[in-house]
Amino acid sequence: NSFSNARMNNVITPELQSESITSADASYILRAPKFKARLTGFYSKIQDATEISFFYGEGIGSDDGGDEDTFVSEIVTGIDKQNMGAELGLEYQITSTIKATAAASYGQYIYSDNAKLKTNDDALAAEGNSPLTDFGTVYIKDYHQPGMPQTAASFGLEYRDPHFWWVGANVNYLANSYIDFANIL
């Protein structure tokens, strides 16, 4: 993410900083002849991340507010994220051939601070003008991160035949997934 659009120009991402990640997790593991369990708590803080996305926009960066289309790079810098939660995994050998498994995860994946937004307009760069437009602060603090469920669970049964074949089935539950938002609106 060092260049806003490396295919088109040599514009370096403004206010670029090294991303830092701080993580910790702790687990408790139980192993018995027929039963296995694992409980894990986790925490992760990501600071100064950069995300670049591309789209066509009307009137972005133009002084006259025209409706011409232009291809822009949306550059969001200074993104801070916080991920924390717990996971549980269980396995029970019901018989010598049948095993039950269960897993669950509950987490909170949020943006922990606001970020900065700029766009890189390829049409302005082609004309030799400054391609960057500063849109200021993006108010994303406490918004949930997109693309992952905050809650997940799974239950499964497995049959292992003594003649070296097996079959299994799982039922999954996913909840509290959030879609991505438009930073520029």
List PLM regions with ranges.
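Structural signature of Gram-negative outer-membrane beta-barrels, strongest in the C-terminal barrel
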Residues: 1-47, 95, 105, 150, ...
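Surface-exposed extracellular loop regions of Gram-negative outer-membrane beta-barrel proteins
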Residues: 1-23, 43-74, 172-184
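Short, low-complexity, polar/charged sequence segments that are solvent-exposed and flexible
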Residues: 34-37, 56-60, 120-123, 176
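Generic domain-boundary/flexible-linker signal
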Residues: 37-38, 50, 113, 180
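Gram-negative outer-membrane beta-barrel transporters
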Residues: 43-45, 69-182
